[in-house]
């Protein structure tokens, strides 16, 4: 488990206008909260934030409020990104205690070459993350799933794999992670018959134009 230092500025002003101004100045608006902590709006340097996201790293945060500094331990709980450019728009930090368990989502890493794929089947991955509960120091970087023995028509669920050391799965055991299907089953789009007339969708009268996507609330 990686551990990083991250500095953030405590902010008093909120709202979309404030958020846009922060982003123009290279800062990302955010908030930190926890079971025993009131939500506190923050601003984080975009470059610094991009260096620590992408995993379940533990963050030793320094919260700067004027001439005061406060130390907190946290993890990134949620990221909101621009749907087109992928830039981070807002970040949620969760305050944690190193002695209390927490629930996090861990990426699934597929390994092996399934027998069913060798026989001409298609691998479909239905779950890309699994929720686990553990102490912060036991958060795994990924959960390895070996699909070597899967044949055509086989599937593998959460209950079929062992949780990493010192962790418990929160995701239901019956949730399917991967399945091997025949090539014909992998084709989802139906092609209309040649003699089937395709009717145009009716025009909706009086429907208002959709506005721009709202930015996340700050």
UniProtKB/Swiss-Prot annotation:
<keyword id="KW-0687">Ribonucleoprotein</keyword>
<dbReference type="InterPro" id="IPR020056">
    <property type="entry name" value="Rbsml_bL25/Gln-tRNA_synth_N"/>
</dbReference>
<dbReference type="InterPro" id="IPR020930">
    <property type="entry name" value="Ribosomal_uL5_bac-type"/>
</dbReference>
<dbReference type="InterPro" id="IPR011035">
    <property type="entry name" value="Ribosomal_bL25/Gln-tRNA_synth"/>
</dbReference>
<keyword id="KW-0699">rRNA-binding</keyword>
<dbReference type="Pfam" id="PF01386">
    <property type="entry name" value="Ribosomal_L25p"/>
</dbReference>
<comment type="subunit">
    <text>Part of the 50S ribosomal subunit; part of the 5S rRNA/L5/L18/L25 subcomplex. Contacts the 5S rRNA. Binds to the 5S rRNA independently of L5 and L18.</text>
</comment>
<dbReference type="GO" id="GO:0003735">
    <property type="term" value="F:structural constituent of ribosome"/>
</dbReference>
<dbReference type="GO" id="GO:0006412">
    <property type="term" value="P:translation"/>
</dbReference>
<dbReference type="Pfam" id="PF14693">
    <property type="entry name" value="Ribosomal_TL5_C"/>
</dbReference>
<protein>
    <recommendedName>
        <fullName>Large ribosomal subunit protein bL25</fullName>
    </recommendedName>
</protein>
<comment type="function">
    <text>This is one of the proteins that binds to the 5S RNA in the ribosome where it forms part of the central protuberance.</text>
</comment>
<keyword id="KW-0689">Ribosomal protein</keyword>
<dbReference type="InterPro" id="IPR029751">
    <property type="entry name" value="Ribosomal_L25_dom"/>
</dbReference>
<dbReference type="GO" id="GO:0022625">
    <property type="term" value="C:cytosolic large ribosomal subunit"/>
</dbReference>
<dbReference type="InterPro" id="IPR020057">
    <property type="entry name" value="Ribosomal_bL25_b-dom"/>
</dbReference>
<comment type="similarity">
    <text>Belongs to the bacterial ribosomal protein bL25 family. CTC subfamily.</text>
</comment>
<keyword id="KW-0694">RNA-binding</keyword>
<dbReference type="GO" id="GO:0008097">
    <property type="term" value="F:5S rRNA binding"/>
</dbReference>
<dbReference type="InterPro" id="IPR001021">
    <property type="entry name" value="Ribosomal_bL25_long"/>
</dbReference>
<dbReference type="InterPro" id="IPR037121">
    <property type="entry name" value="Ribosomal_bL25_C"/>
</dbReference>
<feature type="region of interest" description="Disordered">
    <location>
        <begin position="186"/>
        <end position="218"/>
    </location>
</feature>
